[in-house]
C-alpha cells in the first residue's frame, strides 16, 4: 500500500511524498526545495528515493531536483517540451510511467505553462499548478482556451478522484468563488470549513473532483449563475464556456 504525505516547502508549496512501506522506497512530486525531502530521508534511514515526478518547469517545482538526484540517484520524469533539470525520462501526452509499482497516465494540460503535464493513477491526480482547490493556475504561457480544455479534461476523471495540487491557495480561492456565486451553499460551507482549518494550521488538501465541481468556479463555466455574474461585470454576451473561463481568470488575476 502506498502512503501519500505532504512535505511543506517555501510559504505555500507542498511536495507530495509517495511511500511504499513494503519496499521502503519512495517518490516525490515537484520538489522545488531539496531540504524538506532530505530532512525526511534523514529521519527515515533505510528509505530510498527512487523517482522524482515533475509537472512543469517553474523553479518552485524543480529547484531541488538536481540536489536530490545527485544525493540519491533517483530517476527524474518530466514533460518532454520543457527544460527540466536532470530529467532522465521525457514524457508526453498519453504516456505511462511506472512508479512504486503503480502505473500513472500522463496528461498534457497546457495553460499555466505550455508543456505542463499531470499524473493520474486510479483515483489519484497530481496536477501541479493546473487545477487548484477551488481555483486554477495563472496563465503564464498558455491561452484561456488551452487552460479551459485542460481543466475540462481533468474534470472528466472519476468524481472520487483525489486532487493533489501543489499550493495551499484554497482559502483565497474560495473567497473568489464566493464572489462569483454568493448564493452557492456548497461554497459557503467549504469557505467556513477551510477558514477554520487554516486558523488551526491544518492543510486543506487533497480535494476531490466531486467537491471541485460544486465549488470551483473554473469548473462551473457552464452554470447559469456563473455566466450571469460574468455578464454583470462584462456586459451581456452569448458566451462559450471557454470565454466565461477567460473572463473569470482575468477577474481572479485582479481580485
From Swiss-Prot:
Top EC category: hydrolase
Pathway(s) the chain acts in: Secondary metabolite metabolism; methylglyoxal degradation; (R)-lactate from methylglyoxal: step 2/2
Binding site for Zn(2+) 1: 56, 58, 112, 129
InterPro entries, per the entry: Clx_II_MBL (IPR035680), Glyoxalase_II_hydrolase (IPR050110), HAGH_C (IPR032282), Hydroxyacylglutathione_Hdrlase (IPR017782), Metallo-B-lactamas (IPR001279), RibonucZ/Hydroxyglut_hydro (IPR036866)
A GO biological process held by the record: methylglyoxal catabolic process to D-lactate via S-lactoyl-glutathione
Coiled-coil segments: none
Co-factor note (free text): Binds 2 Zn(2+) ions per subunit.
Catalytic activity: an S-(2-hydroxyacyl)glutathione + H2O = a 2-hydroxy carboxylate + glutathione + H(+)
Record: residues binding Zn(2+) 2: 60-61, 129, 167
The protein's Enzyme Commission number: 3.1.2.6
GO molecular function, one term: metal ion binding
Keyword presence, Zinc: yes
Protein family per UniProt: Belongs to the metallo-beta-lactamase superfamily. Glyoxalase II family.
Self-association state and partner proteins as the record states: Monomer.
Function recorded in the entry: Thiolesterase that catalyzes the hydrolysis of S-D-lactoyl-glutathione to form glutathione and D-lactic acid.
Protein name per its UniProtKB record: Hydroxyacylglutathione hydrolase
Amino acid at each position: 500500500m502506498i502512503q501519500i504525505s505532504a512535505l511543506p516547502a517555501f510559504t505555500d508549496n507542498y511536495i507530495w511524498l509517495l511511500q511504499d512501506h513494503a519496499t521502503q522506497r519512495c517518490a516525490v512530486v515537484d520538489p522545488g526545495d531539496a531540504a524538506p525531502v532530505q530532512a525526511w530521508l534523514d529521519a527515515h534511514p533505510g528509505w530510498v528515493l527512487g523517482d522524482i515526478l515533475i509537472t512543469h518547469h517553474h523553479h518552485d517545482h524543480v529547484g531541488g531536483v538536481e540536489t536530490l538526484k545527485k544525493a540519491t540517484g533517483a530517476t527524474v520524469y518530466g514533460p518532454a517540451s520543457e527544460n527540466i533539470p536532470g530529467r532522465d525520462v521525457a514524457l508526453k501526452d498519453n504516456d505511462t510511467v511506472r512508479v512504486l509499482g503503480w502505473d500513472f497516465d500522463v496528461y498534457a494540460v497546457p495553460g499555466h505553462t505550455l508543456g505542463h503535464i499531470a499524473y493520474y493513477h486510479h483515483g489519484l491526480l497530481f496536477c501541479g499548478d493546473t487545477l487548484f482547490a477551488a481555483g486554477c493556475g495563472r496563465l503564464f504561457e498558455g491561452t484561456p482556451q488551452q487552460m479551459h480544455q485542460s481543466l475540462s479534461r481533468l474534470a472528466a476523471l472519476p468524481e472520487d478522484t483525489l486532487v493533489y495540487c501543489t499550493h495551499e491557495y484554497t482559502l483565497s480561492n474560495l473567497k473568489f468563488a464566493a464572489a462569483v456565486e454568493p448564493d452557492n451553499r456548497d461554497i459557503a460551507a467549504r469557505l467556513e470549513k477551510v477558514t477554520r482549518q487554516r486558523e488551526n494550521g491544518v492543510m486543506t488538501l487533497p480535494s476531490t473532483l466531486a467537491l471541485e465541481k460544486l465549488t470551483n468556479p473554473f469548473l462551473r463555466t457552464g452554470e447559469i449563475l456563473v455566466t450571469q455574474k460574468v455578464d454583470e461585470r462584462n456586459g451581456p454576451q452569448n458566451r462559450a464556456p471557454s470565454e466565461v473561463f477567460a473572463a473569470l481568470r482575468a477577474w481572479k488575476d485582479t481580485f
